[in-house]
A protein has these predicted regions:
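Activation-loop N-terminal segment of eukaryotic-like protein kinases
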Residues: 57-61
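Conserved short submotifs of the Hanks-type protein kinase catalytic core
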Residues: 1-10, 14
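C-terminal lobe helix-coil module of Hanks-type protein kinase domains
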Residues: 90-181
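Pre-DFG segment of protein kinase catalytic domains
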Residues: 64-67
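Protein kinase catalytic-loop region centered on the HRD/HxD motif
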Residues: 33-45
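Conserved activation segment of eukaryotic-like protein kinases, specifically the C-terminal portion
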Residues: 82-92
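Activation segment signature within eukaryotic-like protein kinase domains
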Residues: 29-30
Length: 181
């Protein structure tokens, strides 16, 4: 497999350098991300490891989603319903953390966490180890993005809250719906 060379940096590198991004930058990135993930989902692919390290940003602001290494086809149920936990613990949805299968809404959760990180420069859940973070993903409410930055509109916080709902049924049905909000 060959991938095009992309001049730029990862979103993680950008966040480390700058901390939080401006609201307009974060929204632009999220609009591109939801478009890209919509294309993946429309092709019956769940990424399962969305995080800033897997999103490259070119100098012109265009993003590229990378590392589909643990992605899985939606019709490949034996791969999405194993007892192995896939993905990075800081972005893993509660259902995956508890060993259940991945769905489109698993990627929605990760995008909500990513949006939070873009706007605050930090992760919503921290811990001393992966298990502690996974337990917080499963049980703790996501901290208010507006408490960290009161200039963020309530409508944007509502997008994050809906995307990161603990129950997948309460999240956006797909990336297209998240993009529309």
């Amino acid at each position: 497999i060959v991938m095009e060379y992309i001049e730029g940096k990862t979103l993680k590198q950008l966040i480390k350098k700058r901390g939080s991004l401006t609201l307009s930058e974060a929204i632009d990135i999220m609009l591109q991300l939801t478009d890209g993930i919509t294309q993946a989902h429309d092709s019956y692919i769940i990424h399962r490891d969305l995080k800033p390290q897997n999103i490259l940003i070119k100098d012109d602001g265009t993003i590229k989603i990378t590392d589909f290494g643990i992605a899985v086809a939606l019709n490949s149920t034996q791969l999405t319903q194993t007892n192995s936990v896939m993905g990075s613990v800081h972005y893993i949805p509660p259902e995956q953390a508890s060993g259940k299968g991945s769905t489109i809404r698993s990627d929605i959760y990760a995008m909500g966490i990513l949006f939070y990180e873009l706007l605050t420069g930090s992760l919503p859940f921290r811990g001393d180890n992966a298990v502690e973070i996974a337990l917080k993903q499963m049980h703790d409410p996501i901290p208010s993005v507006r408490k960290k930055n009161p200039s963020i509109p309530q409508s944007v916080e509502n997008i994050i809250l809906k995307a990161t709902a603990k129950n997948p049924k309460n999240r956006y049905a797909d990336a297209k719906e998240m993009h529309a909000d």
